[in-house]
């Protein structure tokens, strides 16, 4: 076996000299290098922003969605939406471990894992799309994938169904970042708080701010409000369109005694919500953009344009122990687990 670069640069076809994630095309030849792991793929969880874009482009026609996904993988060697630039993650079974990783990894052949690196950099071959579940952004396939030496993963827990674990691990970075960023007594606004990542963030934020803090959940409609109310009765819920910054600002200020918030978290899966996240944040506060629909230039120039001196964290989906933190939420909260079971199983 030949040895490749631990970051996967040996798989890059075009353009030369870049890493796999920004590459336009990578090799999805499934003959592994000595420091790679071959995965027999069970399902892809497409990033929410990516799936939404593909679905809208396809006119919500499932067969056209299938064709678009196959086209992307055939052209790029990976599942990276050319419009959003994002990917998702996968679950599968370890089929083969490269010679250089035997004894160095805790994985063994037959382990079921979820990859915690983006599909936007993961070599992928799709042999067949078995089923698509648009309501949960899931694509069940027959296919193979490669995990690089530097790739992170989680062995699927035995105390919950694999689809439940997959749903949570798909957005593991969001609640784990909340655990790091949010402090006692703070005020926090969460946009898209009734979505998968949003509900987990809301639950974690309530824990972190404690009894003297405040968590404000921004949702689109009464249906989402009812769902978020089930997650926690300690979340102050407001209805506003996240693409309308002034509406969001006024709603958040009204819910927070006319004060700006310490932290705003964006979990929305559509574009043009940057300023709705930035405007409600107080001077020297934090805006965390988990959403892959975030535009860096819109956020940076937008904050500058309104004179906001705030810390902005854009799209950082990984933090240490993020998988453990997120799965623990489902163990702690019977209500969260019940909701996830209803939606994602």
Swiss-Prot record:
Catalysed reactions, as listed in the record: (3S,5S)-3,5-diaminohexanoate + NAD(+) + H2O = (5S)-5-amino-3-oxohexanoate + NH4(+) + NADH + H(+)
NADP is among the record's keywords: yes
Organism: Fusobacterium nucleatum subsp. nucleatum (strain ATCC 25586 / DSM 15643 / BCRC 10681 / CIP 101130 / JCM 8532 / KCTC 2640 / LMG 13131 / VPI 4355)
Subunit structure and binding partners: Homodimer.
Record key words, sorted: NAD, NADP, Oxidoreductase
GO-annotated molecular function: L-erythro-3,5-diaminohexanoate dehydrogenase activity
Function statement: Involved in the anaerobic fermentation of lysine. Catalyzes the oxidative deamination of L-erythro-3,5-diaminohexanoate (3,5-DAH) to 3-keto-5-aminohexanoate (KAH). It can use NAD or NADP.
InterPro entries: NAD(P)-bd_dom_sf (IPR036291)
One GO BP annotation of this record: L-lysine catabolic process to acetate
SUPFAM superfamilies in alphabetical order: NAD(P)-binding Rossmann-fold domains (SSF51735)
Involved pathway(s): Amino-acid degradation; L-lysine degradation via acetate pathway
Enzyme Commission no: 1.4.1.11
Domain of life: Bacteria
The protein's enzyme class: oxidoreductase
Family membership: Belongs to the KDD family.
Annotated protein name in UniProt: L-erythro-3,5-diaminohexanoate dehydrogenase
